[in-house]
């Protein structure tokens, strides 16, 4: 994965806010998962949401006796309210939405594959290819364009919700392009795009000035990365009044790159939100991130990408491979042996290590699933052991 091959190469990442239609769907899915897990730690959940206009359809499969206790429609309305969709002029109104509950039961065939009779060991909830990644570009071990794209939108959200900028509305996206030197170090911000929904009576000039001066510039930690050549594209389409699901239909799991590493790493295609931890698309992705982050923090490489592959009903991964960051085959084999011997990559092992039976998932699903140090998969508690065993 030697992506940087010459000086002056640029790389780009995008992010979406919690008010983006796809993110509304993700949050509803994960809020329902959390509500189920509060009462049943062993529930099997696969919750999908589609949201269009003022209609929310909640589908998927849930296997838990507590399902009947959860007011799923109320959960959806509360999420929409908390995001800030309190007026139909914004593109959605929690007070008037129609919510259709189309959730069914999990397939008995899948349940039997995951929960083997006579065994406490869980099999993987599905087949899947999963990647974990980390790099040394930021203190959170995430790519610099990706982290900045998310930070800009978080800043905008805070100013909107606090009332500091009253004309901002919930829907927004950002995109950041950064120039790298030949050693794969970020050196200059080339371009920042922000598209943000707004009140109809605000001029584009004021929108541009406010977003640049009050949101973007205060968010950039290293001011030397901004110069007179940095290009700002604020609402390049012009007016962005019609937003939310009135402007664009939202669907759970459609922002998998914004959820992970902003295009800097491979992705197996499986989304995270709405899935309990027996689904390795989610749990193994968190574990692979944990391993990759500890490897980079230990100084093993500037970046590290790990691939895991699973088969439904089988507890151990069928394949483990370092797919980026290590160019020496002998050293890669040594690292692989260390991973196999020191990390439990079964669903049970991952769930226990990362405490994935807790109702934590709503907090994961906005502004990226990685880089939030409150979660177990972001802890750097394996660094010393890695350094002792693997440091050259």
Swiss-Prot record:
Residues annotated to bind ATP: 20, 171-173, 248, 254-255, 271, 275
Protein name: S-adenosylmethionine synthase
Quaternary context: Homotetramer; dimer of dimers.
GO biological process, one term: S-adenosylmethionine biosynthetic process
Gene: metK
Cofactor: Mg(2+); K(+)
Cofactor note: Binds 2 divalent ions per subunit.
Function: Catalyzes the formation of S-adenosylmethionine (AdoMet) from methionine and ATP. The overall synthetic reaction is composed of two sequential steps, AdoMet formation and the subsequent tripolyphosphate hydrolysis which occurs prior to release of AdoMet from the enzyme.
Keyword field contains ATP-binding: yes
Family: Belongs to the AdoMet synthase family.
Residues at which L-methionine binds: 61, 106, 248, 279
PANTHER family associated with the record: S-ADENOSYLMETHIONINE SYNTHETASE
One function term, GO molecular function aspect: magnesium ion binding
Keyword set, alphabetical order: ATP-binding, Cytoplasm, Magnesium, Metal-binding, Nucleotide-binding, One-carbon metabolism, Potassium, Transferase
Top EC category: transferase
Organism: Borreliella burgdorferi (strain ZS7) (Borrelia burgdorferi)
InterPro entries found in the cross-reference section: ADOMET_SYNTHASE_CS, S-AdoMet_synt_C, S-AdoMet_synt_central, S-AdoMet_synt_N, S-AdoMet_synthetase, S-AdoMet_synthetase_sfam
UniProt pathway: Amino-acid biosynthesis; S-adenosyl-L-methionine biosynthesis; S-adenosyl-L-methionine from L-methionine: step 1/1
Annotated region described as Flexible loop, given as residue ranges: 106-116
First-listed, main subcellular location of the protein, grouped into a coarse class: cytoplasm
Binding site for K(+): 48
Metal-binding keyword on record: yes
Residues binding Mg(2+), per UniProt: 22
Subcellular location: Cytoplasm
């Amino acid at each position: 994965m030697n992506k940087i091959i010459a000086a002056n190469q640029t790389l780009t990442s995008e992010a979406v806010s919690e008010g983006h239609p796809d993110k509304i769907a993700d949050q509803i899915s994960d809020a329902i998962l959390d509500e189920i897990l509060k009462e049943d730690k062993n529930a099997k959940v696969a919750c999908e949401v589609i949201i269009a206009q003022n209609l929310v359809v909640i589908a998927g499969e849930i296997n838990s006796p507590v399902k009947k206790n959860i007011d799923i429609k109320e959960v959806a309305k509360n999420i929409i309210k908390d995001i800030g969709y309190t007026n139909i002029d914004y593109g959605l109104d929690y007070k008037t939405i129609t919510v259709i509950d189309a959730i069914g039961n999990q397939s008995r065939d899948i349940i039997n594959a995951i929960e083997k009779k006579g065994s406490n060991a869980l099999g993987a909830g599905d087949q899947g290819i999963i990647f974990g990644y980390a790099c040394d570009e930021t203190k959170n071990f995430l790519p610099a364009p990706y982290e900045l794209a998310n930070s800009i939108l978080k800043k905008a959200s805070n100013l909107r919700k606090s009332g500091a900028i009253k004309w901002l509305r919930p829907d927004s996206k950002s995109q950041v392009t950064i120039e790298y030197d030949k050693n794969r170090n970020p050196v200059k911000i080339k371009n920042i795009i922000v598209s943000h929904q707004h009140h109809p009576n605000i001029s584009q000039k004021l929108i541009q000035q406010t977003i640049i001066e009050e949101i973007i510039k205060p968010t950039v930690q290293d001011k030397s990365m901004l110069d007179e050549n940095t290009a700002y594209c604020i609402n390049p389409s012009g007016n962005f009044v019609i937003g939310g699901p009135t402007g664009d239909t939202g669907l759970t799991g459609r922002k998998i790159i914004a959820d992970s590493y902003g295009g800097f790493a491979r992705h197996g295609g499986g989304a995270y939100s709405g899935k309990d931890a027996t689904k390795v698309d989610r749990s193994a992705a968190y574990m692979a991130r944990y391993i990759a982050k500890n490897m980079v923090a230990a100084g093993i490489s500037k970046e590290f990408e790990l691939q895991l592959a699973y088969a439904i009903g089988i507890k151990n991964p069928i394949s483990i491979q370092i797919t980026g960051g290590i160019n020496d085959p002998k050293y890669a084999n040594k690292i692989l042996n260390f991973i196999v011997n020191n990390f439990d990559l079964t669903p049970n092992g991952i769930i226990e290590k990362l405490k994935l039976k807790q109702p934590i998932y709503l907090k994961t699903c906005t502004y990226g699933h990685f880089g939030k140090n409150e979660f177990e998969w972001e802890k750097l508690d394996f660094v010393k052991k890695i350094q002792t065993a693997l440091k050259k």
